[in-house]
A protein has these predicted regions:
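Positively charged n-region of N-terminal signal peptides that target proteins for export
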Residues: 1-5
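Extracellular/lumen-exposed scaffold segments
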Residues: 23-252
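Bacterial N-terminal signal peptides
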Residues: 7-18
């Protein structure tokens, strides 16, 4: 049954505090890998490994107006950025974190992704804090507007050994980190039940959700096997806006 392999993410409104970078803060980043439609680089939130050797970092994309890159489950078309960190030294790289995507609808195709700019955060763990950490990546990505163009970007940066202070990029990495969906318990919400419905109009996934904090524009992103597509939900909220029923069309 579909409900067995779908992984739901119910997303509430995200807020973050505006943080000001110090005028004296350094910047740890790779050079930009530049293309006509998009540029990409690596960025780090600290200018040294510190005692624990753990540094939050990210892949930063900057797109020309109208161009986009894709979320980890892109929808009806496209593929997400695919980094390969095999060339890194003294750096264990965590899986990417994925901020809340935007929905795009073109010619009946529903896709999920990012426009303008985005940082996909990850964590660097150095095995030896007495040595520099070199983060090297080959990033394959697809950027689309009326047409889609694939690129392979080569980028690398060095995070020095020693005490680490926040870089000039720490606040922007933190901003996108705050947009990454939290677990249901951390967000104080619960999907109490989910089921499938068949009708003359097609197949739907329906989910009931409750939240301790009133919902504001809730959305539901579903992930499933290649070949299945999931549209934007039709949402019905209770009067207090602390419970919601979301009905998602399934195609494919």
């Amino acid at each position: 049954m579909i409900r067995h392999f779908l992984i739901p993410f119910l997303l509430t409104a995200f807020a973050w505090a505006g943080l000001s970078a110090s005028a004296n803060a350094s910047e740890i980043a790779s050079a930009w890998a530049e293309e006509e439609q998009a540029t990409v680089r690596l960025v780090a939130s600290r200018d040294g490994l510190g005692d624990d050797g753990v540094v939050r970092a990210g892949i930063e994309f900057a797109m020309q107006p109208g161009w986009k890159v894709y979320w980890r489950s892109p929808g009806d078309a496209g593929f997400p950025p695919q980094p390969n960190f095999d060339g890194s030294e003294n750096a264990d790289i965590s899986p990417l974190s994925w901020p809340v995507p935007l929905r795009f609808s073109v010619l009946g195709l529903e896709t999920l992704g990012y426009e303008d700019s985005v940082i996909l955060p990850f964590t660097v763990q150095a095995a030896d804090t007495a040595k520099d950490s070199m983060v090297s990546a080959t990033i394959r990505y697809l950027t689309c507007k009326e047409i889609c163009i694939p690129y392979d970007a080569q980028v690398s940066m060095t995070i020095p050994a020693g005490n680490g202070a926040p870089t000039a990029l720490a606040h922007i990495i933190g901003k996108f980190d705050s947009r990454v969906p939290r677990t249901a318990s951390a967000a104080r919400l619960n999907i109490s039940e989910a089921w499938t419905e068949h009708s003359e109009k097609g197949l739907y996934v329906v989910a009931n959700a409750t939240s301790e904090i009133p919902f504001k524009g809730p959305d539901l992103y579903l992930e499933g096997p290649v070949g299945l597509g999931f549209g934007a939900p039709a949402t019905r909220l209770s009067n207090a806006k602390q419970s919601a029923t979301l009905r998602i069309p399934v195609s494919g």
